[in-house]
């Protein structure tokens, strides 16, 4: 055959493929997610997320150390309070003795600036009803989340996390105006150097299912009045631009795998770093298929992460972070 172009020439050897790779995923771009639960003496496995745990404060530190030694530069902490500490407004979220703030403080004391300590800044784990904010009657008998009252509580939570030692706060509640309000609250409290990673395009996704086991949520119903409709694309661009205008230091798309088109579009216009969250359902599907020997666990996990990175994510929140960092170094 008389061919002018033979693309296979650049696939002939492993060295050639490495030389011509268009993207390269690095451990530093992965963020390890951890759950910390109050009132336990031993870490507890999460049944719907094989290999993941609800940590105690004592087990968290060595787990973070393993992540750091693998090359991870950022962790994201979620707190799971005692049931008796939950209330209508989630007040344990900003209690300096609450489980999440104690976990932040413990990590900062142990690791200092060695890693970026990020914390989830939302109320759903801390409210008795499991919603992401303050519930009020809309005047017609339907309970809804009060946007502005909730944002006020997010500000209290963000400042408490900064005071505990968080480098980054990460509001995930999808309330209008939350970024501007939190930035002002942090600055007023003297935390101008604490950054904000905004959950800018967070969808009302069925892929979040296993996460609710991980945080033992009391949630019933849905979050469709504040999280985005999976049918929508342009709305994400509006949400991301609003967060950038309000002062977000980083923006996020969640989930990642089924929303790579959104990741791509956001990455093309965002002047700030773009994160994507490979969520619990994505993780659980890989684990379930691998447990049945239907797929190669390592190969599929890395392919999924590389796809998210290829789409434009500068960083990826994933339950595979520590393992994937080791795999990448081996490769």
Predicted features by range, described:
Residues 1-7:
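Catalytic domains of riboflavin
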Residues 16:
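N-terminal [4Fe-4S]-dependent radical SAM core
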Residues 2, 13, 22-31, 37-331:
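Alpha/beta enzyme core
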């Amino acid at each position: 055959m008389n061919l002018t172009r033979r693309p296979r020439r650049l696939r002939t050897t492993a060295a050639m493929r490495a030389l011509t790779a268009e993207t390269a995923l690095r451990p530093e771009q992965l963020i390890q997610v951890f759950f910390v639960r109050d009132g336990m003496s031993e870490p507890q496995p999460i049944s719907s997320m094989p290999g993941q745990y609800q940590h105690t404060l004592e087990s968290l530190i060595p787990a973070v150390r393993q992540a750091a030694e693998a090359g991870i530069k950022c962790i994201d902490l979620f707190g799971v309070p005692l049931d008796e500490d939950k209330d209508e407004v989630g007040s344990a979220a900003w209690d300096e003795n609450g489980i999440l703030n104690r976990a932040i403080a413990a990590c900062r004391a142990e690791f200092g600036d060695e890693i970026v300590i990020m914390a989830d800044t939302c109320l759903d784990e801390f409210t008795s009803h499991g919603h992401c904010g303050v519930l009020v009657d809309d005047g017609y008998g339907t309970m809804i989340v009060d946007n502005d009252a909730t944002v006020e509580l997010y500000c209290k939570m963000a400042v408490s996390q900064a005071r505990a030692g968080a480098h980054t706060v990460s509001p995930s509640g999808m309330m209008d105006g939350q970024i501007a309000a939190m930035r002002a609250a942090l600055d007023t409290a003297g935390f101008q150097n604490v950054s904000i990673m905004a959950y800018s395009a967070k969808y009302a996704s069925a892929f979040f299912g296993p996460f609710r086991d991980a945080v033992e949520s009391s949630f019933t119903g849905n979050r469709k009045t504040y999280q985005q409709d999976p049918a929508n694309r342009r709305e994400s661009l509006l949400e991301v631009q609003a967060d950038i205008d309000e002062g977000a230091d980083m923006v996020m798309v969640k989930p990642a795998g089924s929303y790579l088109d959104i990741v791509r579009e956001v990455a093309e216009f965002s002047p700030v770093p773009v994160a994507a969250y490979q969520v619990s359902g994505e993780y659980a599907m890989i684990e379930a298929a691998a447990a049945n020997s239907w797929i190669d666990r390592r190969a599929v996990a890395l392919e999924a992460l590389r796809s998210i990175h290829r789409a434009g994510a500068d960083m990826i929140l994933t339950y595979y972070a520590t393992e994937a960092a080791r795999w990448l170094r081996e490769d």
